[in-house]
């Protein structure tokens, strides 16, 4: 029996995709976005303003390489002068901070401590700082909490393990009973005293309390209580809502009408009622596909009413209670629309927020005074600016930046963006967010990557977002357009739009996407022969269908996308709810329809190289969907296919290492089949090895064996870009300096040594001469620039020409003094040829951590010596002392026009 290899299986035999796949293609320009940039972003959130209105506590989420995940810390910022204080640190996630009503404490949720199996508990920290302490110690942990009084906190939690659970644990019985409604164990309300640490049970409900909200006066609690273990799957038996009177210890069911299942409760400032969201659908029996509208509940009359929004697209991104009414975000496509709603003399009134930038403003929280707000301003081309503002006369007044995040983005290219519109599948307008190539030139055509959002009821907004799932600036750095499409079925466009694909799945979305690329081709922006498409979740689902219906795409990268709706029905965590809504019933009632809608049965039409991503623990889009997709393409053997699994990951990737691998694999695929710039890395080659360093050094400019380049017949220093500075690759060498100082004498063989024993005025004079000779503007680095460069080389100091190198060990200050007599016996001292040690930067810069210390200019124009020299120990605990001039030199900086 003969065995043959298909094209797809041959591709799989090659290992040229492993690790560092895209790194070979990263341009040396530090302003371009890289995978590292995406992963080093920090994020802010969970803002809570102090009762006095002078402070805000918030959460910064930061990447931790050692933990391989994002970690959340608490911060405190003054609203007056933006003073920033870090309250917590470590390896635990500290989240959901809330001020006590008297402003004395901040409570938060955390599993901090040495026990890796620790559950989430309520922790407290004094508002003036200090060490946090744990308030609760429940065996099953705490779900969420709210302050009731300065001494009382209401929280939701499970009871301690029941005897049934304890017995299973003793037996090491970890079998799972699927759909075990009998053991759908309740989540209840409890109250804990700050002073006494005593816990009191407030409810005996049998359902699971998910969301709850405590009234400002501490008398009332409104709850959502899940009733059925199958509800997330089939959307049948919904949660029930209850109103607790904590003073009278009563509980009353509210919102008892059919289909009423409100959520997102916000109390009025006077505690007389609350607002909430409610799903609205045209289907009287199934509201799985819906939009949200606004209701108001009066606690005195126990009645509720729908608030007339007078806005066809209904609610958008939530709401906040203010002195001027409920500040509400209304659905507005890719933007925001902010309005106040208030009942005056029995009539609801709407007034718009008056701000020229309101469509790009998001209100995160409003203080207890109903006026102080934390807001952010962002567009697809403007990273979020976090501000404090005062609400007065329906304006956001006294806006001021208070929290600065990711300042390094100021030194990065940010792609130009715009909201564009074209005619979609039904002849109606479709919106998209278009990102331009970083080096865009009018009249030229560029590649296009279509990046599709999930949902389907998600939305791509005019906000800045760069993530492992979608990274438009990384692609713009590869000189590509990126288009995000708000296809039929997307959210934030009203009920008609979101419901339009019920019974028409794929039929409108795919044409919307294809017509978007047609529009850009027709405008002369995009090269029709260089199109790619990618997406995660529903974005992957639509990407897969697009390459079935069209052969225009040169590459497709679906992550966590369905191909077989029949198997999805039983394996997806919400399979019945989703599939019944969009496909009109279960597969046993509509088998032919399910097959018709499943891309799996059309895989022979695919002609696009495909890379597939999945987490092994994904239940939103079950992992076996990836296997079915991969096996079909692999067995058909028509196109290259690659399948990447991420162990332990759910629907979204959590580990930083997995996020990195996903992006690097994806970019390598794009570089190969779309951009055609991919170069296979040598898996045996270590860039930091002596061989790697020698190869790097071999690319530097030389003239007659001397470092530098010729300009107007004169040998001058070579400059390269490092962190947006055009800096000398080496310290100015003796032979370079000799071109300026004609009578300079030095020993043969030391031409490439750094010029030493130079004072400040001599270094400045050389820069002036160099400027005259070349017609370019050279100078010494400013002190702040030099410190930035030294910081860049901090991790390199141990391997540079400093005293530790000559001693052969990490030398102490005492030992350095003892070693001086030995050093004086060396005829040429400790200096070596520039570039003798490991550099920093992709376009390498040498000797920032040794050889000679270097002159720079302080803010007063005076000379300052900074940096390590061959005579300097690397000991960071010693106060820096400049070395003798024998070990002082300089390097030049070129000012680019």
List PLM regions with ranges.
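A flexible loop/linker signature enriched in serine peptidases of the S9 family
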Residues: 43, 60-73, 88-95, 107-123, ...
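Non-catalytic accessory segments flanking enzyme active sites
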Residues: 46-48, 154-156, 163-165, 182-189, ...
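Residue-level detector of Asp-centered blade-edge/turn motifs that repeat once per structural unit
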Residues: 51-52, 101-102, 148-149, 216-217, ...
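Hydrophobic beta-strand positions that form the internal "hydrophobic ladder"
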Residues: 56, 103-106, 153, 221, ...
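Cap/lid segment of the alpha/beta-hydrolase catalytic domain
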Residues: 405-523, 527-529, 536
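Active-site-proximal cap/loop segments of hydrolase catalytic domains
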Residues: 471-474, 484-693
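A short glycine-rich, aromatic-capped structural motif
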Residues: 702-747, 751-762, 768, 850
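Functional-site microenvironments in short loops/helix caps that host divalent-cation chemistry
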Residues: 749-752, 760, 764-886
């Amino acid at each position: 029996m003969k065995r043959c290899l298909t094209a797809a299986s041959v591709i799989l035999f090659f290992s040229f995709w492993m690790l560092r796949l895209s790194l070979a293609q990263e341009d040396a320009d530090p302003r371009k976005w890289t995978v590292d940039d995406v992963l080093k972003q920090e994020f802010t959130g969970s803002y809570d303003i102090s009762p006095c209105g002078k402070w805000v506590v918030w959460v910064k989420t930061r990447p931790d390489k050692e933990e391989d995940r994002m970690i959340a810390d608490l911060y405190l910022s003054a609203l007056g002068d933006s003073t920033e204080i870090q309250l917590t640190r470590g390896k635990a996630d500290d989240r959901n901070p809330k001020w006590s009503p008297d402003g004395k404490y901040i409570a938060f949720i955390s599993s901090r401590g040495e026990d890796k199996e620790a559950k989430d508990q309520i922790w407290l920290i004094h508002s003036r700082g200090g060490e946090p302490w744990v308030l609760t110690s429940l065996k099953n942990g705490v779900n969420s909490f709210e302050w009731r009084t300065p001494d009382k906190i209401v929280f939701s939690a499970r009871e301690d393990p029941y005897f049934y659970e304890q017995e299973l644990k003793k037996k090491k019985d970890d079998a799972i009973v699927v759909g075990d409604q009998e053991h759908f164990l309740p989540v209840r309300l409890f109250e804990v005293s700050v002073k006494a640490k005593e816990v009191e049970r407030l409810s005996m409900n049998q359902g699971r309390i998910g969301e709850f909200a405590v009234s400002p006066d501490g008398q009332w609690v409104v709850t959502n209580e899940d009733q059925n273990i199958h509800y997330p799957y089939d959307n049948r038996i919904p949660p029930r809502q209850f109103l607790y009177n904590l003073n009278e210890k009563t509980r009353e069911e509210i919102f008892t009408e059919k289909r009423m299942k409100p959520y997102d409760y916000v109390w009025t400032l006077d505690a007389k009622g609350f607002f909430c969201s409610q799903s609205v659908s045209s289907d009287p029996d199934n509201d799985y596909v819906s939009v949200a509208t606004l209701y108001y509940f009066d606690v005195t009359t126990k009645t509720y009413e729908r608030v007339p929004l007078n806005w066809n697209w209904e609610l958008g991104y939530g709401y906040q209670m203010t002195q001027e009414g409920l500040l509400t975000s209304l659905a507005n496509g890719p933007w925001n629309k902010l309005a106040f709603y208030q009942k005056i003399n029995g009539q609801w009134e709407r007034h718009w927020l008056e701000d020229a930038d309101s469509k790009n403003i998001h209100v995160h929280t409003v203080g207890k005074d109903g006026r102080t707000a934390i807001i952010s301003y962002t567009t697809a081309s403007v990273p979020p600016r976090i501000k404090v503002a005062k609400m007065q006369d329906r304006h956001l007044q006294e806006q001021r930046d208070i929290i600065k995040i990711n300042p390094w983005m100021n030194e990065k290219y940010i792609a130009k963006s715009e909201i564009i519109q074209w005619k979609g599948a039904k002849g109606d307008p479709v919106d998209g967010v278009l990102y331009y190539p970083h080096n865009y030139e009018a009249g030229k055509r560029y590649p296009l990557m279509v990046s599709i959002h999930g949902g389907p009821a998600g939305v791509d907004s005019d906000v800045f977002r760069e993530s492992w799932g979608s990274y438009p600036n990384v692609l713009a750095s590869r000189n590509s357009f990126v288009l995000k499409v708000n296809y039929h079925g997307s959210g934030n466009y009203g009920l008609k739009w979101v419901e339009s694909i019920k019974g028409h799945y794929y039929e409108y979305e795919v044409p919307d996407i294809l017509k978007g690329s047609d529009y850009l081709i027709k405008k002369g922006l995009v090269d029709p022969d260089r199109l790619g498409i990618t997406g995660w979740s529903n974005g992957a689902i639509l990407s897969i269908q697009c390459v079935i219906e069209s052969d225009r795409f040169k590459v497709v990268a679906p992550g966590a996308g369905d191909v077989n709706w029949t198997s999805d029905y039983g394996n997806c965590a919400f399979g019945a709810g989703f599939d019944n809504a969009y496909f009109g019933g279960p597969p046993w009632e509509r088998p032919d329809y399910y097959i018709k809608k499943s891309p799996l049965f059309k895989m022979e039409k695919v002609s696009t190289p495909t890379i597939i991503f999945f987490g092994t623990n994904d239940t939103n889009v079950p992992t076996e969907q990836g296997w079915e997709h991969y096996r079909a393409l692999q067995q058909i053997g028509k196109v290259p296919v690659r399948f990447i699994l991420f162990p332990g990951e759910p629907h979204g990737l959590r580990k930083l290492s997995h996020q990195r691998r996903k992006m690097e694999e994806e970019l390598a695929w794009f570089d190969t089949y779309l951009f055609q710039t991919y170069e296979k890395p040598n898996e045996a080659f270590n860039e930091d090895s002596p061989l790697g360093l020698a190869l790097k050094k071999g690319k530097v400019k030389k003239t007659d064996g001397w470092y530098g380049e010729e300009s107007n017949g004169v040998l001058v220093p070579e400059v390269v870009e490092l962190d947006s500075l055009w800096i000398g690759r080496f310290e100015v060498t003796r032979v370079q300096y000799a071109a300026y100082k004609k009578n300079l004498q030095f020993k043969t063989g030391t031409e490439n040594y750094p010029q030493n024993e130079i004072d400040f005025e001599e270094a400045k004079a050389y820069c002036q001469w160099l400027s005259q000779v070349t017609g370019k503007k050279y100078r010494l680095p400013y002190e702040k620039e030099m410190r930035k460069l030294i910081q860049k080389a901090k991790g390199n100091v141990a391997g540079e020409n400093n005293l530790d190198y000559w001693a052969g060990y990490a030398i102490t200050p005492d030992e350095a003094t003892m070693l001086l007599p030995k050093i004086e016996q060396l005829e040429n001292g400790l200096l070596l040829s520039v570039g003798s040690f490991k550099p920093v930067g992709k376009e390498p810069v040498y000797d920032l951590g040794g050889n000679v210390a270097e002159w720079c200019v302080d803010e007063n124009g005076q000379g300052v010596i900074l940096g390590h020299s061959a005579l300097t120990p690397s000991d960071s605990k010693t106060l820096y002392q400049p070395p003798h001039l024998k070990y002082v030199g300089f390097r030049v900086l070129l000012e680019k026009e």
